[in-house]
A protein has these predicted regions:
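Conserved hydrophobic/amphipathic alpha-helical signal-anchor segments
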Residues: 35, 43-85
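N-terminal leader/signal peptides at the extreme start of proteins
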Residues: 1-21
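Residue-level signature of catalytic and energy-coupling elements of molecular machines
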Residues: 31, 60, 126
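A short, glycine- and basic residue-enriched loop/turn
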Residues: 15-21, 30, 47-48, 57
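Contiguous, function-dense segments enriched for cysteine-driven chemistry
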Residues: 26, 45, 100
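Alpha-helical hydrophobic helix detector
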Residues: 24-40
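Periplasmic/extracellular, small/polar-rich flexible segments of pilin-like filament-forming proteins
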Residues: 68-154
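Short alpha-helical segments used as structural interaction elements across diverse proteins
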Residues: 6-9, 13, 39, 44, ...
Length: 154
């Protein structure tokens, strides 16, 4: 009879489920992981959104480089002049609000809504460094006001 009673007790204790402490531990672990993962994901999405702005400058970068190869001064290179594409304002892309060329530099302004918090209203500036001779390529210096700046921008 004692073996039957101990077997019944073992079955009852095995079928009880999780204790409150175990559930609280799981909730605490999920909370800690979320506290780390959410900010990292926002930085990741912010960098991806900035990449759109940098990618959209490629046509203007090529046109500015061609003009610089002819010996033109940086101050004479503006959006819509010569072979430079015109400036774009008011929704240039999904995350980009405007793109302006001024004195050879390309300034991209990100949107103020619908973007990651670390990108809201940020600007990306790509400034050309003219080559010493026409045979060399134009290099570009990137700077941004975004908190989650990409590795290519200082």
């Amino acid at each position: 009879m004692t073996t039957v009673a101990s077997a019944e007790r073992a079955c009852r204790s095995a079928a009880r489920g999780f204790t409150l402490i175990e559930l609280m531990m799981v909730v605490a672990i999920v909370g800690i992981l979320s506290a780390v993962a959410v900010p990292q994901y926002q930085i990741y999405t912010g960098r991806a959104q900035l990449a759109e702005g940098i990618h959209m400058t490629e046509a203007r970068k090529s046109a500015i480089a061609e003009v610089l190869m002819t010996g033109a001064a940086l101050s004479a290179i503006n959006g819509g002049g010569g072979s430079i594409p015109p400036d774009v304002t008011g929704g240039a892309g999904r995350y980009v609000d405007s793109m302006v060329v001024d004195a050879g530099s390309i300034v991209v302004t990100m949107k103020s809504s619908g973007v990651s918090p670390c990108v809201t209203g940020a600007t990306i500036t790509l400034a050309p460094v003219p080559p010493g001779t026409p045979d060399l390529a134009v290099s570009w210096v990137c700077s941004t006001t975004a908190v989650c700046r990409p590795l290519t921008c200082a």
